[in-house]
């Protein structure tokens, strides 16, 4: 006679008539498996199997001390860590640590009193200049050079003003557009495949040990402010840029593999 196959729910109910069986857990390699039993909205008994990856993390002494506090109430006999039966995890809050330069908004920002909103000095958009997606790009350089060219042109019109006149504006020099000259990107590298949580501080920590740099640009989404996944770093010396490509290309960072290459000219 063939044995009758029964479901796991019938077997559990036969062993634990008065209530739910206790939770079970076991560790296999770097994973921990937890099996729990509970009732769903329809009053049916269900089994929930959760898988956790064990990860060692260095924390401060205060955090380690809090984890050793004695639990109380319904969780008095629980093991270390939260219990889904008695603990509800709150919404995770992400903090963005900004450098001191990003707080210097006094000379960077313009406020429109009519609308009471921020006005970007780079693209004239309705956002702070420090959050402008065009910051550090050709548009940013063009805006600054236009202001300088306007002031210099006014000085040319008045030869008795005694103000300094740039060579490119003297005697009808060239086109009057200094930004039209080719920018030197020989020591610039492009870092791609960055995570959305990447910040300027993280980028600074990533490249500062390789060599001195003159400028960095981290591309961000216009609406969310999250990283677009790539950044540009202009090193002071070309050999440092070559070393950055050799060291960081294929390097694992924040669970992603970085791709580092020479920055291509804008006309390509």
UniProtKB/Swiss-Prot annotation:
UniProt keyword list: Cytoplasm, Initiation factor, Protein biosynthesis, RNA-binding
Protein biosynthesis among keywords: yes
A biological process term (GO) from this entry: formation of cytoplasmic translation initiation complex
Domain RRM, chain residue ranges per copy: 187-265
SMART domains: RRM (SM00360)
Annotated localization: Cytoplasm
Record-linked Gene3D superfamilies: 3.30.70.330
Statement: the UniProt record of this protein carries the keyword Metal-binding: no
Listed GO MF terms: RNA binding; translation initiation factor activity
Signal peptide location: none
GO cellular component: a single term: eukaryotic 43S preinitiation complex
Domain of life: Eukaryota
Free-text function comment from the UniProt entry: RNA-binding component of the eukaryotic translation initiation factor 3 (eIF-3) complex, which is involved in protein synthesis of a specialized repertoire of mRNAs and, together with other initiation factors, stimulates binding of mRNA and methionyl-tRNAi to the 40S ribosome. The eIF-3 complex specifically targets and initiates translation of a subset of mRNAs involved in cell proliferation. This subunit can bind 18S rRNA.
Stated family: Belongs to the eIF-3 subunit G family.
Quaternary structure, from the entry: Component of the eukaryotic translation initiation factor 3 (eIF-3) complex. The eIF-3 complex interacts with pix.
Protein name: Eukaryotic translation initiation factor 3 subunit G-2
Record organism: Drosophila willistoni
